[in-house]
């Protein structure tokens, strides 16, 4: 299962093509729209989120509510395009139109300057339009398909925010996907402990008032994953590495940890490894899950615990200094639009990106021409594991 995304932030539409989804999987536009809506919510978001109410149009690969094995094309219209038709036109336009919304003041922390240098652009809008986090809409759309597939296989994924800037959100060590959904899933801050919500809102409002932004840490958990996805035999088959790469590919994500994560570097080994136990009904399990469900680049059958750190949103209403690329004069960086934080939305992106990698791995490992074939292969595999 592989995919591509395309589309500019203010272009006519965003597109994703997914290939390799098993035939026979029930899939509707509504399945995807639910996830798109989640990405657009969350405390601290404004502006464009109110303009756009994303709706997907499926234009290939699905017939009468079921996938047919051919590439699935997903389209999301940018409703704002009507105000950008000439500026974003594919055909050549008059010079005076080219000057409208031209960007020559690169924003620190964005792709603007380096992208312009790399691709020889005079108008840095060519960079902004594609490097914008608007692209994550399609990662969520693809993830929605992946989650639908995983759900059929009784594999579930959820996320919650564990840090907003300096504010740590308390949550128990043992946390099921169901519990995350019932708590963080109902919170506009995407947090487990609702008693911290009021303080957090005040904190975010203060950051906004100061024209500043905050980042944080998001945790995604995956349940129902059998042992043995990924492999130790080659560097590029290690599933933890694939997940880490996918998470860092999300705009503004700068690091990933599994289980104890960086804390593992500070503890002696006796306080890090998970002891192996065996029982008649469960087979091999671990007495704890400090390694976050991975050993040797493979899932070990425990819950996957992945955390990603998101840097603060780089566009500040209290703009940072930059250099105008035409005049080389110092200038205050342009503000296209910005929010104090996008953590709850970024959590939805992360959850869907992790789901996509797990679904890809499953489709690679097992016969996956049809969903029935895949289900059967997984049942047989789990049976084999239980007899080991
Ligand atoms: C869900 C989400 C929403 C984002 N919203 C904004 C935003 O409103 N303004 C902004 O400047 N950056 C936003 N970003 C981050 C930028 O897209 C990102 O920092 C930038 O493209 C540079 O990429 P890098 O941080 O990965 O180096 C957002 C990121 C995510 C994941």
Swiss-Prot record:
<dbReference type="GO" id="GO:0005829">
    <property type="term" value="C:cytosol"/>
</dbReference>
<dbReference type="GO" id="GO:0004107">
    <property type="term" value="F:chorismate synthase activity"/>
</dbReference>
<dbReference type="InterPro" id="IPR035904">
    <property type="entry name" value="Chorismate_synth_AroC_sf"/>
</dbReference>
<dbReference type="GO" id="GO:0010181">
    <property type="term" value="F:FMN binding"/>
</dbReference>
<keyword id="KW-0521">NADP</keyword>
<keyword id="KW-0456">Lyase</keyword>
<dbReference type="GO" id="GO:0008652">
    <property type="term" value="P:amino acid biosynthetic process"/>
</dbReference>
<feature type="binding site">
    <location>
        <begin position="311"/>
        <end position="315"/>
    </location>
    <ligand>
        <name>FMN</name>
    </ligand>
</feature>
<dbReference type="GO" id="GO:0009073">
    <property type="term" value="P:aromatic amino acid family biosynthetic process"/>
</dbReference>
<feature type="binding site">
    <location>
        <position position="337"/>
    </location>
    <ligand>
        <name>FMN</name>
    </ligand>
</feature>
<dbReference type="GO" id="GO:0009423">
    <property type="term" value="P:chorismate biosynthetic process"/>
</dbReference>
<comment type="pathway">
    <text>Metabolic intermediate biosynthesis; chorismate biosynthesis; chorismate from D-erythrose 4-phosphate and phosphoenolpyruvate: step 7/7.</text>
</comment>
<comment type="subunit">
    <text>Homotetramer.</text>
</comment>
<keyword id="KW-0057">Aromatic amino acid biosynthesis</keyword>
<comment type="function">
    <text>This reaction introduces a second double bond into the aromatic ring system.</text>
</comment>
<protein>
    <recommendedName>
        <fullName>Chorismate synthase</fullName>
        <ecNumber>4.2.3.5</ecNumber>
    </recommendedName>
</protein>
<keyword id="KW-0288">FMN</keyword>
<keyword id="KW-0028">Amino-acid biosynthesis</keyword>
<feature type="binding site">
    <location>
        <begin position="251"/>
        <end position="252"/>
    </location>
    <ligand>
        <name>FMN</name>
    </ligand>
</feature>
<keyword id="KW-0285">Flavoprotein</keyword>
<feature type="binding site">
    <location>
        <position position="39"/>
    </location>
    <ligand>
        <name>NADP(+)</name>
    </ligand>
</feature>
<dbReference type="InterPro" id="IPR020541">
    <property type="entry name" value="Chorismate_synthase_CS"/>
</dbReference>
<feature type="binding site">
    <location>
        <position position="296"/>
    </location>
    <ligand>
        <name>FMN</name>
    </ligand>
</feature>
<dbReference type="Pfam" id="PF01264">
    <property type="entry name" value="Chorismate_synt"/>
</dbReference>
<comment type="similarity">
    <text>Belongs to the chorismate synthase family.</text>
</comment>
<dbReference type="InterPro" id="IPR000453">
    <property type="entry name" value="Chorismate_synth"/>
</dbReference>
<keyword id="KW-0274">FAD</keyword>
<feature type="binding site">
    <location>
        <position position="45"/>
    </location>
    <ligand>
        <name>NADP(+)</name>
    </ligand>
</feature>
<feature type="binding site">
    <location>
        <begin position="130"/>
        <end position="132"/>
    </location>
    <ligand>
        <name>FMN</name>
    </ligand>
</feature>
């Amino acid at each position: 299962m592989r995919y591509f995304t395309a589309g500019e932030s203010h272009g006519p539409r965003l597109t994703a093509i997914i290939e390799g989804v098993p035939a026979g999987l029930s899939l509707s536009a509504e399945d995807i729209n639910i996830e798109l809506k989640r990405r657009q919510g969350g405390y601290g978001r404004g502006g464009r989120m109110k303009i756009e109410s994303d709706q997907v149009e499926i234009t290939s690969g699905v017939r009468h509510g079921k996938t047919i094995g051919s590439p699935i094309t997903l389209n999301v219209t940018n409703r704002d395009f009507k105000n950008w038709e000439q500026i974003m036109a594919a055909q050549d336009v008059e010079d005076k139109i080219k000057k409208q919304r031209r960007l020559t003041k690169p924003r620190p922390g964005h792709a603007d300057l380096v992208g312009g240098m790399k691709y020889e652009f005079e108008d840095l809008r060519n960079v902004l339009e594609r490097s914008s986090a608007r692209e994550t809409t399609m990662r969520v759309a693809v993830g929605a398909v992946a989650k639908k597939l995983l759900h059929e296989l009784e594999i579930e994924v959820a996320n919650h925010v564990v840090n907003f800037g300096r504010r740590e959100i308390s949550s128990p060590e043992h946390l099921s996907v169901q519990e995350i959904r019932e708590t963080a899933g109902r919170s506009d801050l995407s947090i487990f402990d609702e008693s911290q919500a009021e303080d957090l809102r005040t904190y975010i409002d203060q950051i906004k008032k100061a024209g500043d932004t905050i980042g944080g840490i998001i945790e995604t958990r995956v349940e129902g994953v059998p042992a043995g996805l990924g492999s130790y035999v080659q560097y590029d088959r290690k599933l933890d590495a694939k997940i880490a790469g996918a998470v860092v590919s999300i705009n503004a994500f700068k690091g990933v940890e599994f289980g104890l994560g960086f804390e593992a570097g500070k503890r002696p080994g006796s306080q890090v490894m998970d002891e192996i136990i065996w029982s008649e009904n469960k087979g091999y399990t671990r007495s704890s899950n400090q390694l976050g469900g991975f050993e040797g680049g493979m899932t070990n059958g425990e819950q996957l615990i992945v955390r990603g750190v998101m840097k603060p949103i780089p566009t500040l209403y209290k703009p940072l200094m930059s250099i105008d690329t035409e005049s080389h004069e110092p200038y205050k960086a342009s503000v296209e639009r910005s929010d104090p934080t996008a953590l709850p939305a970024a959590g939805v992106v992360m959850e869907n990106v992790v789901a996509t990698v797990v679904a890809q791995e499953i489709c690679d490992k097992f016969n996956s021409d049809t969903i029935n074939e895949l289900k059967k292969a997984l049942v047989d595999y789990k049976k084999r594991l239980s007899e080991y």
